[in-house]
Amino acid sequence: MAKFMTPVIQDNPSGWGPCAVPEQFRDMPYQPFSKGDRLGKVADWTGATYQDKRYTNKYSSQFGGGSQYAYFHEEDESSFQLVDTARTQKTAYQRNRMRFAQRNLRRDKDRRNMLQFNLQILPKSAKQKERERIRLQKKFQKQFGVRQKWDQKSQKPRDSSVEVRSDWEVKEEMDFPQLMKMRYLEVSEPQDIECCGALEYYDKAFDRITTRSEKPLRSIKRIFHTVTTTDDPVIRKLAKTQGNVFATDAILATLMSCTRSVYSWDIVVQRVGSKLFFDKRDNSDFDLPTVSETANEPPQDEGNSFNSPRNLAMEATYINHNFSQQCLRMGKERYNFPNPNPFVEDDMDKNEIASVAYRYRRWKLGDDIDLIVRCEHDGVMTGANGEVSFINIKTLNEWDSRHCNGVDWRQKLDSQRGAVIATELKNNSYKLARWTCCALLAGSEYLKLGYVSRYHVKDSSRHVILGTQQFKPNEFASQINLSVENAWGILRCVIDICMKLEEGKYLILKDPNKQVIRVYSLPDGTFSSDEDEEEEEEEEEEEEEEET
């Protein structure tokens, strides 16, 4: 029969736990430890070490006892010996050799320090992966600007061209990578509907200007008309009988080359029945050419500084207007189109009007889009055989060659003009693309570029002409990598999106800090003044009277 053995119970009235140590455990050495402690690590003599702070205490014990089992690399002093310290003359080869030896010694010392402080050791394959990871990280930082140079200025957030209100609703959003993939080939040959205005002939003496024979830029007081689409009387007349999309060449060029833009801009779209009108806002900076917009470090001066972005744009506008008239044979014979300038009143002096001609052209984009555009010519030129060529005249201006990785035009323009135009293509890519699109839309045979610089870098009121250059628009488009098929594809995409909208007023806005354009729906009365409303009411009353 099984017998129950009563266990021995130890009573400890003054504490808890056993009163005495059992005989089998008496005098046995013991040190607190944790089962999670690592007893040591395998020494890898072929691997490379690198510091990883996450594993600094990987092999250390929580109780302080496991460290006696860890591996520490100690220097071997068995090979220590005295050497002769007498200084001898060293050759250049020996000096370089000692330099490399000292570098290797420092590397070995760093490796020993890493081993001592429990730093991770990588095998050769992991070493290559780590190098690849660091290389890709540096490439990413360089590409996206995460890591800035010590002397690089931080980019300030740019302001929007118009304040977005809370009651505006986003209807569509298009990012630039998506637009850059657009292509459209079904574009018909343009058809001239109406030609207006008069042009002066280009003075070929300006082609012989060099940096040694610079010519002062004169201030010429002439009137330039920048009339938007819906205020154009010719477009209003044409809209009654033909076309369903109407715009100006400047507005279309902005859309067609929008993927190069950096600053914010906006275009008003009005959907009236089945027709679309692309307009610009009144009193906006839409017609001001930007300066160094696409440079790595665009101008960021603020306030009244003459190098602020807006003041530079005003200076560029002044230069463009004056150069486009000074390089013509003013006051002499003009080339007249069949119809007069639609924006000139009868009592105005013809010599006070800038040399400009308007060509209203029509394109068929597929079967459903009938596009009518007002295009411009700035002058006319005669060839060797007396043939007439229409030209667009634009100006590149140098404001400070020390900024935006520029080159000094007075030193490089005659001998290295390619370097100058390459720098301008980098710093003003969007502006040059817009000018090229305008010349292509107008059908101009040549695009004339004038090089104008400040008389002194600190004086933004006086300028000198350093030279001129002309391009054929198609060849120049290829030179600046402007795809005409992509430009028409972007325009067709924007038109299709706007055609799907309901009747009303909308705004196409380029985000000031992102590569995105958005389409906003605008409430009634937005961007409309009281005078515009009164004019619309008067026009409606006149139409009603004519009908009765």
UniProtKB/Swiss-Prot annotation:
GO terms for biological process: cap-dependent translational initiation; formation of cytoplasmic translation initiation complex; translational initiation. Pfam families: eIF-3_zeta. The keyword Secreted does not apply. Residues 285-299 are annotated as: RNA gate. Residues 529-548 have a biased composition (Acidic residues). Residues 288-309, 523-548 are annotated as: Disordered. Keywords: Acetylation, Cytoplasm, Initiation factor, Phosphoprotein, Protein biosynthesis, RNA-binding. It comes from the Eukaryota. Transmembrane segments: none annotated. The modification N6-acetyllysine is found at K53. The modification Phosphoserine is found at S161, S528, S529. Its main location: cytoplasm. It is found in: Cytoplasm. InterPro entries: eIF3d. GO terms for molecular function: mRNA cap binding; RNA binding; translation initiation factor activity. Residues 291-309 have a biased composition (Polar residues). Belongs to the eIF-3 subunit D family. Component of the eukaryotic translation initiation factor 3 (eIF-3) complex, which is composed of 13 subunits: EIF3A, EIF3B, EIF3C, EIF3D, EIF3E, EIF3F, EIF3G, EIF3H, EIF3I, EIF3J, EIF3K, EIF3L and EIF3M. The eIF-3 complex appears to include 3 stable modules: module A is composed of EIF3A, EIF3B, EIF3G and EIF3I; module B is composed of EIF3F, EIF3H, and EIF3M; and module C is composed of EIF3C, EIF3D, EIF3E, EIF3K and EIF3L. EIF3C of module C binds EIF3B of module A and EIF3H of module B, thereby linking the three modules. EIF3J is a labile subunit that binds to the eIF-3 complex via EIF3B. mRNA cap-binding component of the eukaryotic translation initiation factor 3 (eIF-3) complex, a complex required for several steps in the initiation of protein synthesis of a specialized repertoire of mRNAs. The eIF-3 complex associates with the 40S ribosome and facilitates the recruitment of eIF-1, eIF-1A, eIF-2:GTP:methionyl-tRNAi and eIF-5 to form the 43S pre-initiation complex (43S PIC). The eIF-3 complex stimulates mRNA recruitment to the 43S PIC and scanning of the mRNA for AUG recognition. This is Eukaryotic translation initiation factor 3 subunit D. The gene is EIF3D.
